[in-house]
Amino acid sequence: MIRLHDTAAGELLPLSPREPGKVSMYVCGPTVYGPPHLGHGRFSLVFDVLRRYLEWSGNDVTYVSNITDIDDKILDRATREGRPWTEVTEHYEQVWWQAMDAIGVKRPDH
């Protein structure tokens, strides 16, 4: 079985789903105020590999992630560009998904 670092316990602990064979993952997604960078790619790939490993191991995985679409950085960019913040987030959310699709990261279930 896979072991993951538990930050609260400060140690590696075996992954033990509440319901055997079913794993739920929530991963914070990006704040979409600019194009994705290497750090975004890294966290996306790390959790994509974990998800795929868990699926390969026979688990039913539910993967949930968010897109932060309102934030000071978004509002600052909108002000600098002279356009509504909703246009900024809509544009960069599309850029985000295109980039993740390009590197083969599976999209979240929700």
Provide a role label for each language-model segment:
Residues M1-H110:
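N-terminal Rossmann-like or analogous alpha/beta NTP/dinucleotide-binding catalytic cores
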